[in-house]
Amino acid sequence: MGSPLRFDGRVVLVTGAGAGLGRAYALAFAERGALVVVNDLGGDFKGVGKGSLAADKVVEEIRRRGGKAVANYDSVEEGEKVVKTALDAFGRIDVVVNNAGILRDRSFARISDEDWDIIHRVHLRGSFQVTRAAWEHMKKQKYGRIIMTSSASGIYGNFGQANYSAAKLGLLGLANSLAIEGRKSNIHCNTIAPNAGSRMTQTVMPEDLVEALKPEYVAPLVLWLCHESCEENGGLFEVGAGWIGKLRWERTLGAIVRQKNHPMTPEAVKANWKKICDFENASKPQSIQESTGSIIEVLSKIDSEGGVSANHTSRATSTATSGFAGAIGQKLPPFSYAYTELEAIMYALGVGASIKDPKDLKFIYEGSSDFSCLPTFGVIIGQKSMMGGGLAEIPGLSINFAKVLHGEQYLELYKPLPRAGKLKCEAVVADVLDKGSGVVIIMDVYSYSEKELICHNQFSLFLVGSGGFGGKRTSDKVKVAVAIPNRPPDAVLTDTTSLNQAALYRLSGDWNPLHIDPNFASLAGFDKPILHGLCTFGFSARRVLQQFADNDVSRFKAIKARFAKPVYPGQTLQTEMWKEGNRIHFQTKVQETGDIVISNAYVDLAPTSGTSAKTPSEGGKLQSTFVFEEIGRRLKDIGPEVVKKVNAVFEWHITKGGNIGAKWTIDLKSGSGKVYQGPAKGAADTTIILSDEDFMEVVLGKLDPQKAFFSGRLKARGNIMLSQKLQMILKDYAKL
């Protein structure tokens, strides 16, 4: 059974601990090392009277057994005072067991305002007050365990207990919300509905049954739910007589009873009543997101089908297998995506490129001599092809986008992305996998420039709750994630994301409101908008490229990553990297929490030698080559004269098709001057970037260099004023 569950050093507050269940909890916690605060007002089960005797007796009993405990005699309506006792005595608060309660049983017609109010004040408001007083302390220490006490009367209702039932079910709603709010701070909140003999149940249970339902048969569940190793959160449990059962909500598939552009009528409700109440193939929603998601799905069906009077969803089970199978191989409509340097720069800024790092300039300044698109900009191109609604139109796929998670991503580049261009994208459903709890749709997107394949994206999309249709679980078409090596990383780099990171990244085209709208994020179960997974993906890939390829985009071949947990803007990303040959394994963590957010990831790089897209020596016979060669020949005769006039070194970057095709240097500073292919051997005074075609236009006098500069066709850096002397060079010495 493993080692005993201990609570050494944990501070536990139990309300209503003077007798019955509360006493059993207090004794059990103390026996296992907890520091216990025994709260009890000292009144009877109707809430009448007060005194210190009940709490003192339990404290004394704990101390006799070698434990540590203090008493508190305040009403739970004064929660701050109750929690202060724990803080004053032990300096912290780890566990709150909201157990205090009273009864005022009356048939509904006989319940007075006082009967109603006092029940809610003690049970519901009292639990609220005590828990709220402990909440901030638990958040600061990143730990807390909370128990709310409901009852079978609250869950199912009971004659003569309308006031009590309402308060007890209210506690369940309170607990469910606290479970959601507290989980990021490691605060768990669960609800129990105990059946046990106590001061309260003596009035509603036979004496022999009260004796059989000992509090000691409930306490073990409470201790387990409050232990640091228990991950249960937001659960509801009935417990008694040594039996424990977990409860959950169940919902029929229901029926859509209205048509588009027609009023909904009670007659339609009546006609579909059997379907509405049919629990065959019932769903079991576990969150408000799942509940809301089904409503969104209904609205989509009404809008697309014009109205459904029958329960189409009920046919899903019998047709799911053939439906999903029919989706395999289906293609989305062809999609064209045009972009300029602006989109490439916007993306680079969105994934953390910055002027703080001079090496990033090539990704964020179009005038950089080696301006390049980050390789992972390719995911934006692939994603765009799926965002036009085509995915929802594929036969066999019924997609509720509120339940879609991005599971994994693969990107392969066949050549570096052009700095600007227009690509045609073709997307196809490569496979559909049944994972039980959901369906994985494998989408392949191929992007072409003319007929040349530029990149291949593979998106793994997980549809929550759509599994169990009997389909296959694996596929040879999936690009498989690979576990990281079992050794310390070879390199670790960190990036602190901005609070505006998601707002900036979404400008690249991912408009999902989950990443910007607090209300939408709340509906999805998050405290605030989260960062795009592909944004984190871009941060990590950029770091791998920088660390192991010196930002040479021509070496980037492929990347695969699995998305594990969300990131909040403002958190610090820690990319850990392992080099094994030309494969760089990596994982990404949130530094503040230690959570792994990208796992089983890798980047494949091309070998160092012979892999550049086109080096200067490979420039070949561009039109500009003849001009530079001619300038070189002329300098042999009149070089000293030109050097005296110019006294500068010019480095030229000649582009072709958006990429650098050749580099040339005209050295008019040393000796008799010289012209050679390649970058300047020393520091260049001026670097000039323009296309092969525009260079020829300048040489032929058809394009004024100044106008070319101000229109962006010619870019220069360094001592730009020296470029004015170029007209003399080109005009006088480059005539063909």
UniProtKB/Swiss-Prot annotation:
Question: In this chain, where does the modification N6-acetyllysine occur?
Answer: K46, K565, K669, K707
Tissue-wise expression? Present in many tissues with highest concentrations in liver, heart, prostate and testis.
Q: Which residues bind substrate?
A: S151, Q706, Q724
Ranges where the record places region (3R)-hydroxyacyl-CoA dehydrogenase: 1-305
Cellular component terms, GO, for this chain's entry? Answer: cytosol; membrane; peroxisomal matrix; peroxisomal membrane; peroxisome
Q: Which GO terms describe its molecular function?
A: (3R)-hydroxyacyl-CoA dehydrogenase (NAD+) activity; 17-beta-hydroxysteroid dehydrogenase (NAD+) activity; 3-hydroxyacyl-CoA dehydratase activity; 3-hydroxyacyl-CoA dehydrogenase activity; 3alpha,7alpha,12alpha-trihydroxy-5beta-cholest-24-enoyl-CoA hydratase activity; enoyl-CoA hydratase activity; estradiol 17-beta-dehydrogenase [NAD(P)+] activity; isomerase activity
Q: In which pathway does it act?
A: Lipid metabolism; fatty acid beta-oxidation
Q: Which residues in this protein are found as Phosphothreonine?
A: T265
Its Enzyme Commission number(s) read 1.1.1.n12, 4.2.1.107, 4.2.1.119
**Domain SCP2 spans what residues?**
624-736
A Pfam family (short name) is MaoC_dehydratas
Q: Which residues form the MaoC-like domain?
A: 484-600
Query: What subunit structure does UniProt give?
Result: Homodimer.
What family does the entry list? Belongs to the short-chain dehydrogenases/reductases (SDR) family.
The protein's name in its UniProt record: Peroxisomal multifunctional enzyme type 2
Q: Which organism is it from?
A: Homo sapiens (Human)
